[in-house]
Amino acid sequence: MNLNKNNFLNYSILIPYLILAGIGIVMIFSTTVPDQLQKGLNPYKLVINQTAFVLLSIIMIAVIYRLKLRALKNRKMIGIIMVILILSLIFCRIMPSSFALTAPVNGARGWIHIPGIGTVQPAEFAKVFIIWYLASVFSTKQEEIEKNDINEIFKGKTLTQKLFGGWRLPVVAILLVDLIMPDLGNTMIIGAVALIMI
């Protein structure tokens, strides 16, 4: 029997998101237009950028919502995205300060500057990835976790294996790479997200 996924759409999440996104665009318009005019720049540039990102996010929501659960649990895809994420974080850290694409912002090295668009912070994607990754891990261990409780989550012969082995290694790697940016704020948020998921 084919189920209509529209029946499972959670409007209590979607509608507040759309309302907040709309309010955000209006607020950016009201606060940036006078400043942009004063500087002699395009008054609608920042509003257009924000609107473009909101539309992009809606498209991404639609695409992800239409994905089959099997695709979201695909270990190969998760692994590829994890490697890209960690490499982008390392790229931000090791490139010299004079390199325009990764110039520091407020002393931290976690941003990639994209000409004509703005900045992208890989750590922001790391928060979403951690939720996705841990949800995938725990969904495959559900029966074992119900049976063995916390012992299944921190499985290992030694303390090192219990803390850093198996599925925990990618989480620790992302936390450490983000910490050396230095970006303590995002590191704490990612760590908190991981703990909540556990």
Curated annotation (Swiss-Prot):
GO terms for cellular component: cell division site; plasma membrane. This is Probable peptidoglycan glycosyltransferase FtsW. It catalyses: [GlcNAc-(1->4)-Mur2Ac(oyl-L-Ala-gamma-D-Glu-L-Lys-D-Ala-D-Ala)](n)-di-trans,octa-cis-undecaprenyl diphosphate + beta-D-GlcNAc-(1->4)-Mur2Ac(oyl-L-Ala-gamma-D-Glu-L-Lys-D-Ala-D-Ala)-di-trans,octa-cis-undecaprenyl diphosphate = [GlcNAc-(1->4)-Mur2Ac(oyl-L-Ala-gamma-D-Glu-L-Lys-D-Ala-D-Ala)](n+1)-di-trans,octa-cis-undecaprenyl diphosphate + di-trans,octa-cis-undecaprenyl diphosphate + H(+). Its EC number is 2.4.99.28. The keyword RNA-binding does not apply. Pathway: Cell wall biogenesis; peptidoglycan biosynthesis. It comes from the Bacteria. PANTHER family: CELL CYCLE PROTEIN, PEPTIDOGLYCAN GLYCOSYLTRANSFERASE FTSW-RELATED. It is found in: Cell membrane. Peptidoglycan polymerase that is essential for cell division. One of its GO terms (biological process) is cell wall organization. GO terms for molecular function: lipid-linked peptidoglycan transporter activity; peptidoglycan glycosyltransferase activity. It is a multi-pass membrane protein. The chain crosses the membrane at residues 13-33, 44-64, 77-97, 171-191. It is an enzyme of class 2 (transferase). Belongs to the SEDS family. FtsW subfamily. Pfam families: FTSW_RODA_SPOVE (PF01098). The gene is ftsW. It comes from Lactococcus lactis subsp. cremoris. Keywords: Cell cycle, Cell division, Cell membrane, Cell shape, Cell wall biogenesis/degradation, Glycosyltransferase, Membrane, Peptidoglycan synthesis, Transferase, Transmembrane, Transmembrane helix.
